[in-house]
């Protein structure tokens, strides 16, 4: 996921401003930029709506680049996982399918305990969303996650398809 995350930075709200030679240059068509901005705004809205502490909400604009990179990295990693395991039937282990284990491994990377004061500090100053929201904000945007866990509209983390983030 980390490699996909870093690759995706080349096409996030900041990276997209640089051309193939690393020069700051607006190389996107007006229509492409408009569509990207519209789709990125969906991501901003998702993270703006997360209440990280009572009365305190995430800053989707400030964390946009990292959230896009998390989203893209997760998609790239899942596609690589499926391609790498396509020829080998992986077993169910401890009641979990390989796909479920993939998403649980992603979630495990971001599991942490931080003090309430640090939640407030990071929400105001860090361009990365808090670990919990790098999971709970990202996974409901990924169709394969719904399939892996049989998520339905009755589940609390369900997001209708037409409301999910789709940058590319």
Regions found by a protein language model. Give the residues of each.
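Zinc-dependent metallohydrolase catalytic domains
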Residues: 10-168
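Short alpha-helix carrying the canonical HExxH Zn2+-binding catalytic motif
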Residues: 1-11
């Amino acid at each position: 996921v980390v490699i996909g995350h870093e690759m995706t930075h080349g096409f996030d709200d900041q990276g997209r401003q640089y051309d193939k030679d690393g020069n700051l240059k607006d190389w996107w068509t007006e229509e492409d930029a408009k569509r990207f901005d519209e789709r990125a705004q969906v991501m901003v809205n998702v993270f703006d709506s997360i209440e990280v502490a009572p009365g305190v909400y995430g800053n989707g604009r400030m964390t946009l680049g990292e959230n896009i990179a998390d989203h893209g990295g997760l998609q790239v990693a899942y596609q690589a996982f499926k391609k790498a395991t396509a020829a080998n039937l992986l077993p169910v282990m401890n009641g979990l399918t390989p796909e479920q284990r993939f998403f649980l491994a992603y979630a495990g990377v971001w599991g942490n305990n931080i003090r309430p004061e640090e939640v407030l500090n990071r929400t105001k100053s860090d361009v990365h969303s808090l670990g919990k929201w790098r999971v709970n904000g990202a996974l409901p945007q990924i169709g394969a996650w719904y399939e892996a866990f049989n998520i339905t509209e009755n589940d609390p983390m369900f997001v209708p398809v037409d409301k999910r983030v789709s940058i590319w």
